[in-house]
Regions:
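Context-gated lysine
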Residues: 1, 12, 74, 133, ...
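Non-catalytic terminal accessory segments
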Residues: 1-130, 362
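N-terminal signal-anchor transmembrane helix
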Residues: 72-77, 98-174, 191-192
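Soluble catalytic domains of enzymes that build or remodel membrane lipids, polysaccharides, and related
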Residues: 138-363
Length: 363
């Protein structure tokens, strides 16, 4: 049978994912062990058959973990990967330094291990912190203040229901008029009402736009679940709250998703238009379509440095507030409120973003 476009897209995603896993498994689990063994003079412990065997064992473990067969030790696998990425970066820097400078072998390796361990501990600590970032946006369309709070990439599944409770408590303390979640609220099929129950305690109208992980998990079960917890899901739809019109568009692989979907959504004239779109793409089409503020996520700002450079190679906007070239609108890319995979951040932070919207000249 001929494959549909959706099937091709799914298989392409699977192939790309497992190619990434192959490379990431070697970089995080194998390369640091092989390199440190070589530097210490124990390369005979890691001949190439042993190296290949270790690589294959790691990939098998990851596959079993993703399939749910090793659910109890999945956190160990993913955190080992995060720590391995930190050591990979430190090892690469050390390799480059050895080409340029005379470095004592054993002292150098001790430095690699010490710096890698310190950065790993810092990453684990930083993965638990939540930073509140405030922005002021003025518009002649507004006559009174409105506080909008953005969450993005919370990743319940990778993160626990307890973490969501912490997030909700911080959000409620900010006194928002509305809360928006710009995709990737969950990332695991097994997430249910128990993990998401804290959403019922949000003290303001809450809206969700669909991210890529919601699509992967499956919307047939997820959408009714989050709606039963008081969250309005905006799928190619809008909602008016006073002078604000919130517009949600589903995440898609296509770079033209905003250009295609935005003109089809009914709009109210004179409102301050806020677009919720998960990927930081399509902002020119958004501003051309009358959007005043576009909110995105997806990038995690790289989550664990130096992956921010890899993310930057794919997306030109990865974190922060970007003005429209015409000066008429703004685009904010959240670094994410949670973490995917290891609960670690290096060179980035978990963020709750506040937008204090108000009339021009009012601050």
């Amino acid at each position: 049978k001929r494959m549909t476009g959706q099937s091709v897209s799914r298989w392409k995603r699977v192939v790309v994912f497992w190619l990434f896993v192959l490379v990431a498994a070697y970089a995080a689990y194998v390369y640091p062990v092989v390199s440190i063994s070589r530097w210490l003079g124990y390369s005979q412990w890691m001949p190439w058959p042993v190296t290949i065997g270790l690589w294959a064992l790691v990939i098998l473990g990851l596959w079993c973990s993703f399939r749910g067969h090793l659910r109890m030790i999945k956190p160990l696998w993913v955190h080992w990967m995060g720590i391995g990425f930190v050591f990979f970066s430190v090892c690469v820097v050390y390799e480059l330094l050895c080409l340029l400078l005379p470095i004592d072998g054993h002292r150098g390796v001790l430095g690699v291990i010490s710096i890698g361990a310190l950065l790993s501990l810092l990453s684990l600590f930083n993965g638990q912190r939540i930073v509140v970032k405030s922005n002021n946006c003025a518009s002649p369309k507004l006559t009174r203040p409105f506080r909008l709070v953005q969450l993005s990439d919370v990743h319940i599944g990778s993160r626990s229901g307890r973490y969501l409770t912490r997030v909700v408590d911080r959000v409620n303390a900010l006194g928002p008029d509305a809360v928006v979640i710009t995709g990737d609220l969950v990332d695991t099929e097994t997430v249910g009402e128990a993990e998401l129950a804290a959403l019922k305690k949000v003290g303001a109208p809450t809206f969700l736009s669909i991210g890529n992980h919601e699509r992967y998990v499956g919307l047939d079960a997820l959408q009714p679940l989050v709606e039963s917890l008081g969250v309005t899901v905006l799928r190619q739809a809008s909602q008016v709250i006073g002078e604000i019109q919130l517009i949600g568009i589903d995440d898609a692989e296509s770079a033209d998703q905003v250009a295609v979907q935005l003109p089809l959504i009914e709009r109210c004239g004179g409102k301050y238009n806020v677009l919720l779109y998960h990927r930081p793409l399509g902002w020119l089409d958004a501003f051309a379509g009358g959007i005043d503020l576009m909110l995105s996520g997806h990038t995690h700002n790289g989550q664990i440095s130096p992956f921010n450079w890899l993310v930057r190679a794919q997306f030109s906007r990865i974190h922060g507030l970007y003005p429209a070239s015409s000066g008429a609108g703004q685009h904010y890319v959240s670094p994410g409120t949670g973490t995917w995979g290891p609960v670690m951040r290096l060179g980035s932070h978990n963020e709750i973003t506040v937008f204090d919207l108000g009339p021009t000249g009012d601050g």
